[in-house]
């Protein structure tokens, strides 16, 4: 029913922790059975969005094979671990509105890459496991 779907979308949008995401998925499974990949994708996007905001990412944009993450807080010092894990794929730009970008490789999921990068930033680990 439409009211149930709207409520589910509201619950997904309110996700703030991994535990919240698990609770929402469990509830959806109890009510409707195994959720389609699109619903799992919404849960994943919601969790990554919240985690990114907590570590100082103000906006995320995908342009072609580039993920662009805007932040006034995250700089080269905080990107060390990201640059080690993804060598030759990270570019930092401090001119104008500061951002860093990552190249998405052929066949790679932009969402998985984004999740992996965001969880490497300082503060992400303590925030997502609650």
Over which residues does each language-model region extend?
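Accessory helical-bundle/CTD segments and flexible terminal tails appended to RecA-like ATPase motors
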Residues: 1-130
